[in-house]
UniProtKB/Swiss-Prot annotation:
Residues 189-205 have a biased composition (Low complexity). The lineage of its organism: Eukaryota, Fungi, Dikarya, Ascomycota, Saccharomycotina. Residues 1-27, 188-217, 267-337, 370-398, 595-634, 681-804 are annotated as: Disordered. Interacts with RFM1. This interaction is required to recruit HST1. The modification Phosphothreonine is found at T697, T817. The gene is SUM1. This is Suppressor of mar1-1 protein. The modification N-acetylserine is found at S2. Residues 1-17, 267-279, 287-298, 305-323, 370-385, 610-629, 704-716, 781-793 have a biased composition (Polar residues).
Amino acid sequence: MSENTTAPSDNITNEQRLPSGPKDDVDTLALTSAQNQANSLRKLDTDANAKALPSITDIPVSDDSDIKRQVGSGFGSNPLHIKDSEAFPHSSIEALKEGMDKVTKQCNDLKTALLSKDTSLTDSVQDLFNSLKVLSHNQSVLENKLDDVMKNQVNTDILVNNLNERLNKLSTMLQNTSKVNHSNLLIENSSNNTSSQHNTSSSRRGPGRPRKDASTSTMNKLVSNAASVNLKSASNQGAPFSPVNITLPTAVVQTSKSKRYFVEPSTKQESLLLSAPSSSRDDADMSLTSVPQRTNNENGKERPSTANSSSITPTPVTPNNLIQIKRKRGRPPKKRTVETMISNSTDTIDKSDASNRIKNEIPINSLLPSSKFHQIPSSPSNPVSQPAPVRTSRSATQEIDIKSLELASLISTNGDPNAEDSNTTDTVHNNVEGKVNVEENKTEKEKIITIKSSSENSGNNTTNNNNTDNVIKFSANSDINSDIRRLMVNDQFSLSYDASGNITVKLPPVSSPAAATAAAAAAVTSEMNRQQRELDKRRDSREKMLVNMKYNDRDKAKSFMESNKKLLKAMKEEERRKRMTSIIHDNHLNLNLNEISTRSKIKSAEKPTTKGSSMSPKPRSASISGISDHQQEGYQPLEQEKLVDIDNEGSNANSDSLKMGLTISAADTVHKVGIQSMLNSGEEAITKENAEYERKTPGDEETTTFVPLENSQPSDTIRKRTAGDDGALDQTENTSISPKKRRTEDHTKGEEDEGERGVGNSGTLATVENVSGDISADLSKGTSSIHNDTESANDSSNGNGNLGLGTESRNTLLTATPIELICREGFFYRRDIPDVPITTGAYLEFKFKAKEEELINSSINEEDYAAKSKHEKMNAHFFKPDIQEETELAFEILSKTTLTEKYVNSLEYFLMEFRWENKLVGLGLKLRESKRTWQRRKALFALFEFWRDQSRDKRRFHNYTILHAVKEMENYRIFINRSVSWFYNHITLLKMILYDLCDNVTTQWREWMFPHNETLPALGQDGINEDNLNETIDNMLIFDFLDDGSENNQVKYSRIIPPDIR
């Protein structure tokens, strides 16, 4: 400011010099004619100058206008002076210019000073606001810390209380122990006194250490001390001990990650992001400046925490100081698409750098030709290349977990001079790949990849050298790393399937197995990314919703139903209409079914152990089940109907003892009994059993096959029944009475019939042959134990009519004869037959068949079904006749599939297992699972029926069966990447989506469906039989761009050929 204040004084000085010019120029003026006039003018000029030049202190600060005005006033009144100035203007104008320049410069300086002051003021205000932001953020951090401190205080109080309870409990235990010890010491003291008196009286002592003299006094002291302790702890008796389940708060106690650490606002957050585990990647979008390490000794492990946030200096991010974010509860999210798999961790960076080093050292373009090939013979110029099969597989125990690639054997060089260099290169590659895999195994487990040198001696050595390829085989049934398992066809590789379903990729001749592995891994990654993107593009909006749904996300399902109320209402209306029409439609078959049921009872009395579906002679009461979530078709019965047998002549004499007033006239018999027989799943099973029994020959009775029910005319059945009535009338009367009477008569007969049945069952089961043709050596051994358990259970239940302990265990356990299987590379083998893997049908028969025979034998002596509690009534699913036939056919075809670990988690296996479980539940089995779970499993089978009916009616697939429905639903399950349990927990949602697809078949055809312009494969057409129907259906359901899905990439189950290990 001093410069600005002194500047005007200079201007004043300049202004004072301005009139001095005319004073000096008076002598140089030209002479005039009038000398007086000149003198007067000189005097006037002098007076004017004296008036125009005041003192320095009196001159005010003025701008340019004042100067101009003063100059004008000084020269305008004197024309002669102006003329003199025009004559000599140079000195005055130059002085004026200098003054003007100085004023202009000083004005500019003043403007610059004002602007700089304004900018500094603005910056100060901005800093103030930033400081306020920092203070606000620190305030929130301190509030969170205070909240943690309060929680710590609460937890500390609870722990102190629990510690007090434990001390009280301990004092009580010490008191009780001291009382017992006191009584024992008194007894010992009395005995010791008597023995010491005896010893002192005797002069001879026996062997052993002599007793101390102060033993009695020491024991007395101990007793007195214990008594004093008991008196002190008597008043501290506390509540009974309860376990403490409270843990101290961690760094993630209800505190958002954005508030957990202090971040300076001026720091760039993008450069400070830390990676999180994949299970909690959606919550890991936080930025950290500095994370001081604090270790809490909790559960014996050290974990990083966040106690101090004062440091601002960034800490280098290393794997040692990464924040250990706690994984959320529940199932971790699946890897949906490649776009969502973003990793920022340092181990991924190291792995990519190592992979880049491998690519730089082994360029893939130099290993592979630009064109696609199938078989490339090795040229004489490359004698080093030998076949290097790389086969990925896993052990049966699933315990193989490595951290580097292992070289099984070196490549044979056949005398090549470059062998030493080649081996050196292999060692370098193996070291680099080992480092890569060490980093990869920090985040996921990987299976071993063994590189072997194999010489295919198909002829002589010359032939072997001319047909040398590098073959990489990936096992289709092994649960290995998905990146390696998803190698598909691209421009550099030739892919094919061998007999075992393994994926074989042929490479051109390379110099080392490490090069082949690197090339295959690169191809796997690129192809997998492309296929994942392609799969995600082909999913519609609803399929993407199902893929991205969490397992128990019911809010999304409810919102979908709320937004599609019209669709839900139309679907339920159609289901109700079908339920009503199905009863009327099936009434014409009811009398026929009733006749068959009566005759089947006669046959089952003669042959109590047939191979079809078993009858259930227990009385049932009819009611319809209703479960929540709209998951049932509605026609599944909760309780089975009472059995009613009516003779052809209309005689109802033996049915007078039946309850609920079912003795009706012959005119009303057809309608009422028809509904009862339709609601009775037991009689449908009896129909199946009788049809199987008549078609069997004596030589086929020992094989376990499931022949579908053949349609027979009602007239033929009545004619056969009339012909057989004369010979079997007495037995018909005995079988038509109520189960309660029959149980009473059997009880009066004693143990004879039961013993005969036991012998018959043992003889039959001893020759049972499973589906795969293997005779079980253990099944007949376990049959006698089953029969003995049944007899003991029956003996315990005959006295009071209630279920005893043996019956409870019998109805709860499914496997009376456990099966010991060996798992090897995803296949299951019996211990007595370790060469041939077991089939699914054989496994299920081993699991359920013995229980079925046991339930058949024990059902006669069980109590009435109506007397059971509601919890015990686990109702069987009702099969309509056509559904029953198609289900048995599907079971017959699918039972030939080899059992694998992946097949157990499929809908096909669910169908086969549900068929067995439903049969046993109809016989009175109580499953270990809850009733709600069983209802949902029944609803899933009802979903198959729903899709089958919709496909027949709206998709115009007239030969569509349950087998087609299950295969297509399995394809749909793979397409949306969901589990079987997810299916029967989202029945209504799936029904709505499938119902809408069937309403718009022409516009909404999906990739997982059967082709709409082709004929469905069925038995009897184009040479299709039961042996090749399953594979034919699988061939129609393969995706164009994938094998059978993204996450479930595997060979179709029908094409799996187990390896021959013999």
